[in-house]
Every structure is written in structure tokens, then in C-alpha cells.
């Protein structure tokens, strides 16, 4: 009886191994700092790091405030990532995208909303002179405004003041 049970056990184990299929692991892209806004661009992690690098490298900071669950943010992200001119010009900026509201009161400008894109000069002055097209949310952009954003990016590259 004991040998029959051992044989059944071995048969059961062998059958289990034979029938077992390897479940392929889900391949998912790691979350990068770009969050889909431009995977080939270099992004900083924090607002403070962005300010430091903007000043040190004498480049403007482009801050994108968005939400992962906001349809307007998602649509703008898609347009931003697909616009070749913006992707190329963005290489001239210190780039930061955040899914939270930065605590710097200078970035509040006309309220808290998303998506919002703000430029900060290397002299650490917020470029309030580079709004989007809307009076109620001055620093928001929609996919249809992507060329306006491109023009504002060009203007942001003209620095407010250069140090001697």
C-alpha cells in the first residue's frame, strides 16, 4: 500500500510539472521622470533641482504641472510628445514635470489648475510674460495651442538678463 501511495505521489508531482505552464511576466516600461512628455529628453526630479540647474547652466526652466488622470493633461502630453519642434527645442531647457502643486507661491500666478506650463528664467524670475491663450487660466495650453507653446518656448530662450 505504501509503495502505491509513493508511486501515485510521484506520478502526481510529475504530471504537475509537465502540465505547469510558465506565466510570462508583464513587460512594463519603468516609470521615468519624463512621464511620457519626452522620453529622450533629460528631466530633473524636483523644483529645487530645476532652479539650481537653471542658474548653474544658464538655461530657462520649463515647469509642466499636470495630472495623470486629467484628460486635458493627457491630451496635451500627447501633443507635446509628438511635436518634433518642441521635442528638439526642449533640449535647450531644464525640464521638470510634476503631478503635484509646487509650494512656491510665485508659481501660483493665476490659481491652481492643470495643465499649467510656466517658464522660469535662469535669474530665477518666473516668466509671467509668457502666457497661453486663455484669460481665465493664463498658463494652460490645449493640444490646438501647441504651436503657441512652441513660440513661447522660443521667447523663453531669450533670457531676461545675462550676467557679466
UniProtKB/Swiss-Prot annotation:
Gene3D superfamilies: Glutaredoxin. Residues 1-20 form the signal peptide. Its main location: secreted. GO terms for cellular component: endoplasmic reticulum; extracellular region. InterPro entries: AGR/TXD (IPR051099), Thioredoxin-like_sf (IPR036249). Monomer and homodimer. Belongs to the AGR family. This is Anterior gradient protein 2-B. The lineage of its organism: Eukaryota, Metazoa, Chordata, Craniata, Vertebrata.
